[in-house]
Amino acid sequence: MVLKAPIRWRCGLVLTMMLTSALGSVAQPAKPTKVFMITDMEGVDGIFSTELQCLPFQSPRFEESRKLLTGEVNAAVDGLLAGGATEVVVWDGHDSSRSLSALDIHPQARLLMGLPISPTLELDTSYSAVIFIGQHAMAGADKAVLSHSYSSEGIQNIWVNNMLVGEIGARVMLAGAFGVPVIMLSGDTAACKEINQLVPQAECAEVKSGVSRTAGFTLAHPAACALIRQKSQRAMERLAQFKPYVVTGPVEVKVEFTPKGASTFEPREGVKQVNERTWVFSGKDIIEAWLKYSSF
């Protein structure tokens, strides 16, 4: 004989199951999507001269350059937020952090400025992505506008485990050490090529193209900002497709200084000299090796 539960009990059970199912399907609070924006000036639209445009409070057109950079930064923040970012931290990364102002920055962004900061840019595992705005290519890159690797006066070349890198490559690797992918860059044609060699799927806003190191073609500022907004939003919408660039095992950072840079470099114990102008900084990982180099 099959015993049947009372109708009232059965109805209550069904209702409980329905409520449990409904509650289980309620969306949980989304994990914050925090983006770190690295900014520079040499890759900004309309900028082709260091002396005329890029030296803080010395260049006659520096204030104009600040406005161009700020416009690109704010366009990128707009795009990131539209694409799903919940927090954007903007690092004022050009020439000792003297280019951006809290008066002008996007109201929904936070600004990291001043010195000193960590050589790893205060990055940590709380970030979901890194982007570059106004970025230039590495020293020696072909037809790259105002190209250099950290210091045009002091550094000739940098290698990480024998891979030639500039600021783009080094920071892609440092971000990867924290499990954070780089998803987007704005800059000139050469900078876009550089990021895509490391992160082929990265979105790139090509705002200008060089015909030499100090000349080239540029988009008008409104067009550059519109492109940056579009590319940053697209990168954010595609975030799930990106993985961090991870350098495994022991790491050697090899730095070839310019003659001027070599003359002022003071080696310390544990750093290997390769030749008159080249030194190797070793570590168990990219962070340890980079911190050794950056401590000089």
What residues fall within each predicted segment?
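A glycine-rich helix N-cap at a beta->alpha junction
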Residues: 107-123
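Active-site rim beta-loop-alpha module in soluble metabolic enzymes
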Residues: 174-182, 186-231
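Active-site glycine-rich loop that binds ribose-phosphate moieties when present
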Residues: 152-178, 187-190
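Bacterial N-terminal signal peptides
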Residues: 12-22
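Boundary of Sec targeting at the N-terminus
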Residues: 28-30
